Amino acid sequence: MRVLIVKTSSMGDVLHTLPALTDAQQAIPGIQFDWAVEEGFAQIPSWHSAVDRVIPVAIRRWRKAWFSAPIKAERTAFRRAVCANQYDAVIDAQGLVKSAALVTRLAHGIKHGMDWSTAREPLASLFYNRKHHIAKQQHAVERTRELFAKSLGYDKPQSQGDYAIAKHFLHCQQAVSDPYAVFLHATTRDDKHWPEANWRELIGLVGNTGLRIKLPWGAPHEEARAKRLAEGFDYVDVLPRMSLEEVARVLAGAKFVVSVDTGLSHLTAALDRPNITLYGPTDPGLIGGYGKNQMACCSPEQNLANLDATSVFGKIH
């Protein structure tokens, strides 16, 4: 059985889809998935053993020059890739008009998605042959697991979902002389940031544990912040620029992770690493960390400035 998944973004949403693949793999031996996903997240599906082919899409980049010759050529190549197979099922787990019109519509096979009342954008459901009612008041992982179960005809397991990608990185782990923690300090929204003074206080508290601390970054301003956080602490390493897979290897080897609400926090959960995620304005209930050893640390009045380092350090122990 061959199935096309349409789940293009964001990092957290792509990761939240993985447990559904594990369910399907256990229910339908030999099932294989192709996956249409934004080029920036194309490494993620390849980590799961049920994925045969990753089809990168670049909607975010293409729309900046939609009718230019190079972009037209890329769109044509993408269309050919999506149309290359007759699928037993096409599952649109994105639920957006954009992805339904530009990806799902093109694919050959019976198209499944959420119905008018439960899709993220109701109009997207018009592109589906089979529309499934998936209750909204449940975690995003569970919604996607239910969608796959209904689309492929098996009962959704009652057990916690399994991302099943941690083993991909086990063979990559090398002996590390110094145990370490990872602090994920970078996120896209200003109100999701934890003040630098709080991070530095937490770094100071961790100093007595004998652990090193690693600080990844993805953009120049994040690198500058990491250097400010590390200043004066000889047990803190500002990492070089890394690919997503390289960051995943670092996370997979960590004793624990402390993170703000960011895509890499969801990657930590997918790798089954202990993780304390700091939440301010966002509610972790429906879209927070999902998996083993995931702890939400919510700030008073939904303001991360009110979350003190001592409280966070207490949760480490």
Swiss-Prot record:
<feature type="binding site">
    <location>
        <position position="187"/>
    </location>
    <ligand>
        <name>ADP-L-glycero-beta-D-manno-heptose</name>
    </ligand>
</feature>
<keyword id="KW-0448">Lipopolysaccharide biosynthesis</keyword>
<feature type="binding site">
    <location>
        <position position="242"/>
    </location>
    <ligand>
        <name>ADP-L-glycero-beta-D-manno-heptose</name>
    </ligand>
</feature>
<feature type="binding site">
    <location>
        <position position="222"/>
    </location>
    <ligand>
        <name>ADP-L-glycero-beta-D-manno-heptose</name>
    </ligand>
</feature>
<protein>
    <recommendedName>
        <fullName>Lipopolysaccharide heptosyltransferase 1</fullName>
        <ecNumber>2.4.99.23</ecNumber>
    </recommendedName>
</protein>
<dbReference type="InterPro" id="IPR051199">
    <property type="entry name" value="LPS_LOS_Heptosyltrfase"/>
</dbReference>
<keyword id="KW-0328">Glycosyltransferase</keyword>
<feature type="binding site">
    <location>
        <position position="266"/>
    </location>
    <ligand>
        <name>ADP-L-glycero-beta-D-manno-heptose</name>
    </ligand>
</feature>
<dbReference type="GO" id="GO:0005829">
    <property type="term" value="C:cytosol"/>
</dbReference>
<keyword id="KW-1003">Cell membrane</keyword>
<keyword id="KW-0808">Transferase</keyword>
<dbReference type="InterPro" id="IPR011908">
    <property type="entry name" value="LipoPS_heptosylTferase-I"/>
</dbReference>
<comment type="function">
    <text>Glycosyltransferase involved in the biosynthesis of the core oligosaccharide region of lipopolysaccharide (LPS). Catalyzes the addition of the first heptose unit to one 3-deoxy-D-manno-octulosonic acid (Kdo) residue of the Kdo2-lipid A module.</text>
</comment>
<keyword id="KW-0472">Membrane</keyword>
<comment type="pathway">
    <text>Bacterial outer membrane biogenesis; LPS core biosynthesis.</text>
</comment>
<feature type="binding site">
    <location>
        <position position="188"/>
    </location>
    <ligand>
        <name>ADP-L-glycero-beta-D-manno-heptose</name>
    </ligand>
</feature>
<dbReference type="GO" id="GO:0009244">
    <property type="term" value="P:lipopolysaccharide core region biosynthetic process"/>
</dbReference>
<keyword id="KW-0997">Cell inner membrane</keyword>
<comment type="similarity">
    <text>Belongs to the glycosyltransferase 9 family.</text>
</comment>
<feature type="binding site">
    <location>
        <position position="192"/>
    </location>
    <ligand>
        <name>ADP-L-glycero-beta-D-manno-heptose</name>
    </ligand>
</feature>
<feature type="binding site">
    <location>
        <position position="263"/>
    </location>
    <ligand>
        <name>ADP-L-glycero-beta-D-manno-heptose</name>
    </ligand>
</feature>
<feature type="binding site">
    <location>
        <position position="261"/>
    </location>
    <ligand>
        <name>ADP-L-glycero-beta-D-manno-heptose</name>
    </ligand>
</feature>
<dbReference type="GO" id="GO:0008713">
    <property type="term" value="F:ADP-heptose-lipopolysaccharide heptosyltransferase activity"/>
</dbReference>
<dbReference type="InterPro" id="IPR002201">
    <property type="entry name" value="Glyco_trans_9"/>
</dbReference>
<dbReference type="Pfam" id="PF01075">
    <property type="entry name" value="Glyco_transf_9"/>
</dbReference>
<feature type="binding site">
    <location>
        <position position="262"/>
    </location>
    <ligand>
        <name>ADP-L-glycero-beta-D-manno-heptose</name>
    </ligand>
</feature>
<dbReference type="GO" id="GO:0005886">
    <property type="term" value="C:plasma membrane"/>
</dbReference>
